[in-house]
Amino acid sequence: MSAFTPASEVLLRHSDDFEQSRILFAGDLQDDLPARFECAASRAHTQQFHHWQVLSRQMGDNVRFSLVAQASDVADCDTLIYYWPKNKPEAQFQLMNILSLMPSGSDVFVVGENRSGVRSAEQMLADYAPLNKVDSARRCGLYHGRLEKQPQFSLESWWAEYNIDGLTIKTLPGVFSRDGLDVGSQLLLSTLTPHTKGKVLDVGCGAGVLSAALASHSPKVRLTLCDVSAPAVEASRATLAANGLEGEVFASNIFSEVKGRFDMIISNPPFHDGMQTSLDAAQTLIRGAVRHLNSGGELRIVANAFLPYPKILDETFGFHEVIAQTGRFKVYRTVMTRQAKK
């Protein structure tokens, strides 16, 4: 994170206005502006583990990664700068949580790209901190208001669930495929055969649907699940618990916190980071898998058919095969052999 995002560049146009402010940064924090912004004091709260990794190097204990912010995260802050994400329910969850903790009279700034739907912040906060647009540049909008009324926030009210093949899937705002099983994951699930054994790592686990489905017909698997998203980690834990399944679930930036080797790695890797298309996560997943697969271990991923994963798979493992496909998606399989580039 060296270059600033367009949203941060818009904020920097107003940097003189924040010199005396005690700021909490939250939302989609895709650069290190919170660590470098000139103000009286700065804190940050994020639900994204990879954002916490970057910011914690410079901000230390003044940045926290968790599902929900606590009173200690907003201590002494008089200003919120919220970076609008592309997911509206995620924004509502985070804003209701944080504004329920901020003192009345706090300044509230919301900034984001126009295409992300940042304009809907006006309606969302109308009853709590009526917003006015104060700048428009770099295809972004910057809005300001003052907190007039603290919203009520209860985490329990934000949980949702759906059922698939007798399994209960627990979800939260910001979790991939929150409202039901996505087509890509469904295709990957169709390739997982009963009686699978050994250690299985589910990277980018989301709500835990892949692992739950696998364990339901392969009770001898030993599951490990990880995701960069705090809501995903908590949703996966809840999904396993709801179905009487066991597994280790933790936050990790792809393999950053993963230890040991596995007999199978499964994933429906993301190819967006915020509003931007990015293959970085999938490339890190494929190239890093060789350090986390046992000999003969298998990597199985699903991806949009147009993405250039075959080239990366062949460069890393020496071969790949397509074991299922539709018009939009393909499931790729490769195996850890001596020719894989460790």
Curated annotation (Swiss-Prot):
Keyword Transmembrane helix: no
Enzyme class: transferase
GO terms under cellular component: cytoplasm
Swiss-Prot/TrEMBL keywords: Cytoplasm, Methyltransferase, rRNA processing, S-adenosyl-L-methionine, Transferase
Keyword S-adenosyl-L-methionine appears in the UniProt entry: yes
GO molecular function terms attached to this record: 16S rRNA (guanine(1207)-N(2))-methyltransferase activity; nucleic acid binding
Pfam families with a match to the protein in the record: MTS, MTS_N
EC number per UniProt: 2.1.1.172
Location of the protein in the cell: Cytoplasm
Domain of life: Bacteria
InterPro entries, per the entry: DNA_methylase_N6_adenine_CS, Mtase_sm_N, rRNA_ssu_MeTfrase_C, RsmC/RlmG, SAM-dependent_MTases_sf, Small_mtfrase_dom
Reaction(s) this enzyme catalyzes, per UniProt: guanosine(1207) in 16S rRNA + S-adenosyl-L-methionine = N(2)-methylguanosine(1207) in 16S rRNA + S-adenosyl-L-homocysteine + H(+)
SUPFAM superfamilies: S-adenosyl-L-methionine-dependent methyltransferases
Family classification: Belongs to the methyltransferase superfamily. RsmC family.
Protein role: Specifically methylates the guanine in position 1207 of 16S rRNA in the 30S particle.
Subunit structure: Monomer.
Protein known as: Ribosomal RNA small subunit methyltransferase C
